[in-house]
From Swiss-Prot:
Molecular function per GO: coenzyme A diphosphatase activity; magnesium ion binding; manganese ion binding
Listed name of the protein: Uncharacterized Nudix hydrolase NudL
NCBIfam families in the cross-refs: PRK10707.1
Described purpose of this protein according to its UniProt entry: Probably mediates the hydrolysis of some nucleoside diphosphate derivatives.
Cofactor list: Mn(2+); Mg(2+)
Residues annotated to bind Mg(2+): E83, E87
UniProt cross-references to CDD domains, sorted A to Z: NUDIX_CoAse_Nudt7 (cd03426)
Gene source species: Shigella flexneri serotype 5b (strain 8401)
Pfam family, any one: NUDIX
Length: 192
């Protein structure tokens, strides 16, 4: 697939719905969810945030809107929608959920389910000052180009795991966020 010419219709036709894996949860893993907001345009965008530098965890990092599943959330999808509304004022009713990607285990002990949703292009984003320092849109075709991500193997407590690194304008996209974007690219058939 030529990444420069990806249209929303191309993306939607390539994206195959996956259901969350039911019995994948190891003991002591907390659940979290992120929304992968695809902006509905002829050449779609990918909405990302930069976390506040004042947060205890992942301060200043580029991320998708999301967070822990609360007791009040009916599902991981409901959690992703609630968090997107809290962090960047995306109303849940404005999101057309088209599916989920397989859960990802975070280094902080969460099992994170990426929820893929289409959002209108004219939403007035409003960053929650406590959690988000910036909201920006990256062209989806650029985001899904696998050649932009570079591997880094990290060794911690005798274990090794690979993270992916990339820049978009002044934003450093890496770690779980870059990994989720790569999984989305692979899901729609982008070849490494």
């Amino acid at each position: 697939m030529e990444y420069r010419s990806l249209t929303l219709d191309d993306f939607l036709s390539r994206f195959q719905l996956l259901r969350p894996q039911i019995n994948r949860e190891p003991l002591n893993h907390r659940q979290a969810a992120v929304l992968i907001p695809i902006v509905r345009r002829p050449q779609p965008g990918l909405l990302l945030t930069q976390r506040s530098i004042h947060l205890r965890k992942h301060a200043g990092q580029v991320a998708f809107p999301g967070g822990a599943v609360d007791d009040t959330d009916a599902s991981v999808i409901a959690a992703a929608l609630r968090e997107a509304e809290e962090e960047v004022a995306i109303p849940p009713s404005a999101v057309e959920v088209i599916g989920v990607l397989p859960p990802v285990d975070s280094v902080t002990g969460y099992q994170v389910t990426p929820v893929v949703g289409i959002i209108p292009p004219d939403l007035p984003y409003r960053a929650s000052e406590d959690e988000v320092s910036a909201v920006f849109e990256m062209p989806l075709a650029q985001a899904l180009h696998l050649g932009r991500y570079h591997p880094l193997d990290i060794y911690r407590r005798g274990d090794s795991h690979r993270v992916w690194l990339s820049w978009y304008e002044q934003y450093f996209v890496w770690g779980m966020t870059a990994g989720i974007i790569r999984e989305l690219a692979l899901q729609i058939g982008v070849k490494p």
